[in-house]
Amino acid sequence: MGQKVHPSGFRVGITKKHQSQWFARFNKNKYSQTVLEDRMIRDTLNKLFPELLNPSTKGGSAPKRHQNARIKKSRITQIKIERNIVPYQIGIQIHAENCKLLKSSIKNLQVKKDILVKLQKTRQYLTNLKIKLDKLTNAPAETQVKTNFEDSTKRSVGQLELSHEGLNTKLSKIKSLRKKLAKLKTGTSTTRANTTGTRQKKLSSKTKRSISQLLKMKLLRAKLAKLVQPKLKRKALEASTIEKTTAKTLKTKKKVSLKRKNKFETKLTKRQLKRQRVFKKRLKLRKFIRLRDRLLISKGLFLQKKGHKITKKIVLAPTPKFLKDFSLNPKVYLLPVKRIEKLLTPKKAAKGGQKSAAVKTVRTSLQTNIYNSRIQKKFVTMYVEQMKKKFLPHLNELFLEYTSKGFDSNNKAVLSLGYMKQWDFERRVDNLKVQPIEKLDRLVHNLRDKFVMKLNLLRKDFITFGSFSSNSADILGLFQLYNFLMKLKNLVNGLKLNLKHKIKTRLAISKMNGSLNTSRNEPELRSRETSQASDKLRIVDSTNSSLPQKVFRKKLENISNEYRKMKFIEYLKDVVQKHRTDNIYLYLASISESRRKLKEIKNEVKQHLDLYLPGANSIKELNQKSSEDSINLATNEVNNVLMKLAKKHPFDRTFLDCKFEELERRKTMWVQNLQLVPKISIKFFSVNQKALNLKASIVSESVVDALEKRKAFRKVIKTTKENLMRNSEIKGVKIQVAGRLNGAEIARTEWVRAGRVPLQTLRANLDYSYRTANTIYGIIGVKVWIFKGFTKLVTESTGA
């Protein structure tokens, strides 16, 4: 049958269960964990959506007709999985026929109690936030139209006053009318009893009275309906019940709490009790295993992993005398002597004293080498840390020197070495003023990134050489870029303020002239300039609103969709975390990497603590007295800085702000990686009907359905092949069926092919799928290959 071999060396299975195309980026170490995870995610999603689309009712499952119709509407063609930083970010793409139906089915998903509580809290928070934002947004709209608003408010206030004053009078009227109705009812009942026997006689005076009484009752009921409106009912009930409820609240709270406990406690079945016992046994076993592992680790008998090598830890030799004084922790300098003896002893060793002498020489040489290397490493790290601390202050001093000498003026005479035309602001001012604000914003962002890159390169040079000359071209170029960036920022801010001011003045003038309230007879007096200015102002407002604010607005527009999305993502996160804990031996390398990265971030923050946090000195002073107070103060400082950053627009952020935000983002990423929690993003893609019928997965499903309905396998294969070959896009088809076909005792394989199906070529665009049909006689395997032509190769240009 043949299998493709990927150019990078990994096999891409065509005849395997998972798809022929591979979308995960992976390294050598992380290949195994990504394969298992991707396969697990695909299986869970393929099983989950049919269950969600057909939830079981109380009486039993829904009828099969409706189930089949619903599944056909929402067929999943492909599930792509993309990875950015393995195993943290997972991007899932679901290609299906009817995506809306799949999204709506997520509401039937059952989640754990802890996750559900968190989701409910977030939903409540979002609803409260939406109400507050609506109030804020409606307030300025009301102030713009003052005249209409004042009239409406006066009317509403008058109505409220009347309702509050005349509430008691209306209630008294209602009581009197109800009493009259009760009297009339008693009178009518007696008259009806008398009139039952004498139906054939003429209407007496009593019966005439009864009719008049009924008419009166109708009129009274109509009056009551007018008086007793739903709003008045509510107000009356509120007024009467406030005093009663306040008195009873304290008494009822205790009773309700006791009742709730008894109400929600349900009796467990035998099966549930058995499960509980099993879980308890498992917990005991796990605790015992943990204790045993800890004891093994403490004794040094546990397996130890160093990089890619796994070795057993052997009892180590004691430390030499000269190393004990060097460090407080002597365990660091223990040497694996027994293992070295086995490796370095010669094959034909001499007897007695010669062997021991050889081992002693090896020991002494190793000890001296390790001692020297450790000292060198320590001094190198100290030197690097000192140079990193010196870099920024040294650069600031140089920049101040340049400004004092007049390098800021961008003269060619002054900047003979590092002069660059592109960073000359005075030459480009006239051209920049004409450009739109959006374009200028992008330019600022790009220049900032360029500045950061150059600064990092300079830092590396400074660490290696120890200093840099004041007349170097790189530093002068960086200084020129910095000045250009600062001036450009000021220019853009000035342009935005001018635009706002112009539009406000024009709007005020138009209100005075009455040009805003245009009618059919009066044409709109709006010039081209004002329309352009208003459009520009919209752009300015959109840029001023920061990115988190935009995200929040989108979320608040449709809370139900957001809740559904969060529910699905949290469910998948829980599934992946459970899978990772079960197969933790595959994630040992990623855990160690995340720990190393967190240490690096910690050291970086320690070095530049004065720059990142304004209250760093107070934290250091507190740390000497009490560690707990210093930790609390540090957390508060970090939270304050992050809050300020969130409020700031990206355009107004400094280099240090961007750096601090980046560090915080990296920290959260590596912490979640330690906890084996992934970051999942889901996208749904709708597939056209034409493209859907040409997918191998759907063709195989149709063959499986036909076989399960006891149709003849040869006819099914032939018809599917003919239907596919009618399409011009398809170049070749191959369908294979294997098992007890038509209930035969001996299993066999049958296959049909039309056109070309090259399985051995890498350039071939092949779509493959494998499904199993569960029949009465057993399982029948179905394989489908669809060839859609060759992919285009990048040909090298044949030039001179």
From Swiss-Prot:
Part of the 30S ribosomal subunit. Residues 1-118 are annotated as: S3-like 1st part. Belongs to the universal ribosomal protein uS3 family. Keywords: Chloroplast, Plastid, Ribonucleoprotein, Ribosomal protein. It comes from Chlamydomonas moewusii (Chlamydomonas eugametos). One of its GO terms (biological process) is translation. GO terms for molecular function: RNA binding; structural constituent of ribosome. The keyword Cell cycle does not apply. Pfam families: Ribosomal_S3_C. This is Small ribosomal subunit protein uS3c. Residues 665-800 are annotated as: S3-like 2nd part. PANTHER family: 30S/40S RIBOSOMAL PROTEIN S3 (PTHR11760), SMALL RIBOSOMAL SUBUNIT PROTEIN US3C (PTHR11760:SF19). The keyword Signal does not apply. It is found in: Plastid, Chloroplast. Signal peptide: none annotated. Its main location: plastid. GO terms for cellular component: chloroplast; cytosolic small ribosomal subunit. Residues 119-664 are annotated as: Intervening sequence (IVS). The large insertion sequence is present in the RNA transcript.
